């Protein structure tokens, strides 16, 4: 697999309502944002940059040899922040930028490479992302789990918090929010869970802030729908398994800390 040249950008904000100062949370003796950057460094990325509006995050990165750039604090979305960074770095329009979330300290470097490669193989798309089949019916009906449906070429048709596609026959008589999920079967075709990892062409990132917010984006609270509303194509890489868990809450943080310690113990001295 020959991976194209690409840059990883990791947005990081301190203003988390569920887990304050999340990027600076300790995981194995280092801030979480540093652990994420280390995973990105282990990919084939030519450059890894943390994008933050918080000097404390930039200082933590500098202390561990991680490149960081300060951005404006008023960006309405993470993609808008990436747009500013693409301009700051002077990236060419055809350069590939992979957006790795700042709360994914266990992300597989190989997945980062695969998403960058997927975009390189889809010249008709401005964006690439990833998805995996769901095996838990509770996640299918969970609005916090974003689903995606694709066309025959693997391009996204729609992203939604609703259970899509709706299995008319398998779910006949099932209410939109069933009370007894254990009794609801999985549909015959896979329900794909969206993985929040994106590869962009830098030219698209420059255009993104000029695109008007879309009604579907606002209804679902999914910013990728803005790109689709304005006619951009998104290539979806289908993986066989779910990625490692991210960190949204204090409970997530404890789980990731335990998984980190376990992985270090398995590697040995």
Swiss-Prot record:
Offer one Pfam family short name for this entry.
CTP_transf_3
Q: Which UniProt keywords apply?
A: Cytoplasm, Lipopolysaccharide biosynthesis, Nucleotidyltransferase, Transferase
Q: Which SUPFAM superfamilies match?
A: Nucleotide-diphospho-sugar transferases
Write out the pathway annotation from the protein's UniProt entry. Nucleotide-sugar biosynthesis; CMP-3-deoxy-D-manno-octulosonate biosynthesis; CMP-3-deoxy-D-manno-octulosonate from 3-deoxy-D-manno-octulosonate and CTP: step 1/1; Bacterial outer membrane biogenesis; lipopolysaccharide biosynthesis
Q: Give any GO molecular function from the UniProt entry.
A: 3-deoxy-manno-octulosonate cytidylyltransferase activity
Q: Name one GO biological process term.
A: CMP-keto-3-deoxy-D-manno-octulosonic acid biosynthetic process
Q: Which CDD domains match?
A: CMP-KDO-Synthetase (cd02517)
Q: In the UniProt record, does the keyword Transferase occur?
A: yes
For this protein, what reaction is catalysed?
Answer: 3-deoxy-alpha-D-manno-oct-2-ulosonate + CTP = CMP-3-deoxy-beta-D-manno-octulosonate + diphosphate
Q: Which GO terms describe its cellular component?
A: cytosol
Q: List the disulfide bonds.
A: none
Subcellular location, record wording: Cytoplasm
Catalytic activity, EC: 2.7.7.38
- What HAMAP family does the record tag this protein with? KdsB
Primary role: Activates KDO (a required 8-carbon sugar) for incorporation into bacterial lipopolysaccharide in Gram-negative bacteria.
Q: What is this protein called?
A: 3-deoxy-manno-octulosonate cytidylyltransferase
